[in-house]
């Protein structure tokens, strides 16, 4: 079994996803009701995928997911990943003093632009600011959207030593521009300028 979400890297709408079921897997619905396809039957049909898809399908969401997948196939996953890594490098190079921040992941990998093992996001904190506070400032003062907190991965943050507050997650994508990343770096630096340098030594 392989479950996936559609609204992240696949560029689909929220509320989309899927479950890939291997031929050897034997699974059955844990609760049954109206199937939408054969309302006279009290149980789900035996054929797939209808056996696992009760009710009215999310047609608009699936159509959007299909278009997202088409874009990925047309642009190429490696090409998109290369662009995302370059955008992170632009952000890193645009910061006045990257060492003032706490980085999670290999910041030298970003600076070197090789990006080996990194996807289009980075966890970053500014000592002196809780991640949620930093995210609120970026939103309210600079109209920059980031994600703060544990990112649905509390055990990963326990491993990183960032539990329970988490990190500020900066995510980039296919449509992210170098200008946007430079503006984001300027916003981070403006917030950092309000913190005494001795209280803002990154790790």
What are the residue ranges of the model-derived segments?
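Pyridoxal 5′-phosphate
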Residues: 1-203
